Amino acid sequence: MGQKINPLGLRLGTNQDHYSIWFSQPKAYSKSLQEDQKIRSFIRNYIKNMKISPSGVEGLARISIYKRIELIEVRIFLGFPKLLLENRPEGLEELQITLQKELNCGNRRLNILITKVEKPYSNPNILAEFIAGQLKNRVSVRQAMKKAIELAEEADTKGIQVQVAGRLNGQDIARVQWIREGRVPRQTIRATFDYCSYPVRTIYGILGIKIWIFVGEDK
């Protein structure tokens, strides 16, 4: 069996940055790691509960965390920030206050920034959310994948591979289906990728969605 590595982890330190940037003493490391997990889970649940988009695509690309001695800076990368801010203008301030209480920051300030993703459908997390919404609405797997690839091509991606695994279309035996368009050099270390692995719960069980998007290549 082939051993499959996470393409983002493989490229850390070459052309991929960490999503959390901070330093900690060895004894306090696990506590800081749990704090990061709590921040990400809280923000994801907050955006999910707001139900900002009728299509079911929340548009959350990623959450980056930067920590200093007196400051925690959280950057939320959203594909559709207008929906969040128009739906609830005071939402960002409310999120900041609630999260600060949840974390028990003490003397540290919490600062939340929202950054817009210029081409939302060039991000694998947003595309995976779109496919998950289609599968929940009983659209066939092949059709959902093809539509996602069309959206990615409109966003000028250089290459994309979409894979869905599980009981596809309610079949008794679990299968894997994938489609690739353009160039996807997964073995090349200098090739920059965006990647996500996204589970979706359907009436037939849990399906796994994986998306690789080829961004470019370092010279």
From Swiss-Prot:
Cellular localisation: Plastid
Principal subcellular localisation of the protein: plastid
Residue intervals of the KH type-2 domain: 39-118
Pfam (any one): Ribosomal_S3_C
Gene3D superfamilies in alphabetical order: 3.30.300.20, Ribosomal protein S3, C-terminal domain (3.30.1140.32)
Molecular functions (GO terms): rRNA binding; structural constituent of ribosome
CDD domains linked: KH-II_30S_S3 (cd02412)
GO biological process: translation
InterPro entries referenced in this protein's UniProt entry, alphabetically: KH_dom-like_a/b, KH_sf_prok-type, Ribosomal_S3_C_sf, Ribosomal_uS3_bac-typ, Ribosomal_uS3_C
GO cellular component: cytosolic small ribosomal subunit; plastid
Membrane spanning stretches: none
Lineage top rank: taxon: Eukaryota
UniProt keyword annotations, A-Z: Plastid, Ribonucleoprotein, Ribosomal protein, RNA-binding, rRNA-binding
Subunit structure, as described in the record: Part of the 30S ribosomal subunit.
The family this protein is said to belong to: Belongs to the universal ribosomal protein uS3 family.
HAMAP family hit by this protein: Ribosomal_uS3_B (MF_01309_B)
Protein name: Small ribosomal subunit protein uS3c
Species: Cuscuta gronovii (Common dodder)
